[in-house]
Amino acid sequence: MKETKILTAGDSSLLIQFGQEISPEINAQITAFVHLMREQHLEGVTDVIPAFTSLLINYDPRVIDYRKLKRRLEKLLKLEVSKKASSSRIFEIPVCYGGEYGPDLENIAKHANLTTQEVITIHSSSDYLIYMLGFLPGFSYLGGL
C-alpha cells in the first residue's frame, strides 16, 4: 500500500497513516487492512479503530512489544490486499426534515435557491459512504454530503 506510515500513539498503540486526503480509495484500503488484520489474529492486538485516513491499533505490550508488532504490520502492509470490502451493507437511516428537528431547512432551501422538497429529494436520493464511527454509539461520519 502506498504512502503508509506507522507512527507511535502512546505506550500501547500504533497509528497507521494511509494518506492525507479523505477519499473512498483510502477508506477501501483501511477497510481491507482491517479485514486482513482480523484474519491474521495478531497476538496482543486488543482493538483496531478505523478513521478517515488512519487506523489506530491498540495492543497489550505485555503480550507483544512495539518493535515486533511494527515489523508484523510492515509485512502485512506489503501484501497485495483486495480493496473490495468483503461485507458491504446498506443501512437505511430514518430522517426528519423541518419542524423542531430541522429548523434550518427553509434557510438551506432559500440559500440554495431550491424548494424545501427539492432539498429533501437531493439529500435523501443518494447513498453515502460511512467512513468511520464517531464518539457516540451509532454516530457515523458520512462521505458524499
Task: Label each PLM-derived region with a short phrase.
Residues 1-145:
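Conserved "landmark" site that anchors the functional core of diverse proteins
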